[in-house]
């Protein structure tokens, strides 16, 4: 990830290269909670970023450990609260369903926890194993984990989004997706990621 100074230089270059006078949204994938710092958030605000995405993937620590994510559930909460406190009023959160070993109850727990944070939009990704992902490299280790109750999982996530006042605004599929499911974005009115629907 970029250091704050590098991020500042990059965003200066972006600002110098494009006309922002009619800009309606400036989104940055802030990414993993362990890579987000107060200094980086300050740089984003300085350059007029209006929407960020924080990507916990799951709120179950055992799953994060299993898939090789280096952040903790507590870091997710702290990072989200920090971004809110610093003034970000349009925060998306990304979750992945179909992660190894996750049951309906694990996904239900993640959805309950995200509702406590109350982001402005929510993206539910179905697991798609990338070529260099740990799940692909160590496929034998994860071969016994399967996704269950696909339709019920998507209904559970949709209900959580609805409880937060969100509606679906985009859907797409990708290669090697688990369980024949889709990726779905939910948002409150006026908080949809414009770049997702152009």
Regions found by a protein language model. Name each.
Residues 129, 139-198:
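Auxiliary Fe-S-binding modules of radical SAM enzymes
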Residues 1-157:
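Conserved non-cysteine loop/helix-boundary elements of the Radical SAM core domain that shape
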